[in-house]
């Protein structure tokens, strides 16, 4: 599972998802990509599940890139614990996704296969996406 090796602060405020992404909206490495069309959080388990679905479909041919990283800790208190007594321990790592962000890229595979593989990967994610290609 993806998670940061070292953080300056162990816990972070929840914050709000709004606006457009500051970068990562264009295809940089590959010829085909998966682009987010809405805001949301994607956790490390979803990222890994989508990556596995992608690589199984293309049978390890070509090359893929994951263009985002889960760098935000999400905390959760245990079940049946009273309120107060501080913030709970880190439960998961998530990536904050804004519309237009490129999530996955790939090259070295035919267009139809890339489209199908990225469609399978998109089913594993919690945000709406669309298929994009280099023009």
UniProtKB/Swiss-Prot annotation:
Keywords: Ribonucleoprotein, Ribosomal protein, RNA-binding, rRNA-binding, tRNA-binding. GO terms for biological process: translation. One of its GO terms (cellular component) is cytosolic large ribosomal subunit. GO terms for molecular function: rRNA binding; structural constituent of ribosome; tRNA binding. Pfam families: Ribosomal_L16 (PF00252). Binds 23S rRNA and is also seen to make contacts with the A and possibly P site tRNAs. Part of the 50S ribosomal subunit. PANTHER family: 50S/60S RIBOSOMAL PROTEIN L16, LARGE RIBOSOMAL SUBUNIT PROTEIN UL16M. Belongs to the universal ribosomal protein uL16 family. HAMAP family: Ribosomal_uL16. This is Large ribosomal subunit protein uL16. It comes from Desulforapulum autotrophicum (strain ATCC 43914 / DSM 3382 / VKM B-1955 / HRM2). The lineage of its organism: Bacteria, Pseudomonadati, Thermodesulfobacteriota, Desulfobacteria, Desulfobacterales. The gene is rplP.
């Amino acid at each position: 599972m993806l998670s940061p090796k070292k953080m300056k602060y162990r816990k972070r405020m929840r914050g709000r998802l709004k606006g457009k992404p500051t970068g990562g909206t264009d295809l940089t490495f590959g010829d085909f990509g998966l682009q987010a069309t809405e805001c949301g959080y994607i956790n490390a388990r979803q990222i890994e599940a989508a990556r596995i679905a992608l690589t199984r479909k293309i049978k390890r041919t070509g090359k893929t890139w994951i263009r985002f990283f889960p760098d935000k800790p999400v905390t959760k208190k245990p079940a049946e614990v009273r309120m107060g007594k501080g913030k709970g321990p880190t439960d998961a790592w998530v990536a904050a996704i804004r519309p237009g962000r490129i999530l996955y890229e790939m090259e070295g595979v035919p267009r139809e296969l890339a489209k199908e593989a990225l469609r399978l990967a998109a089913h594993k994610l919690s945000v709406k996406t669309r298929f994009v290609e280099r023009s």
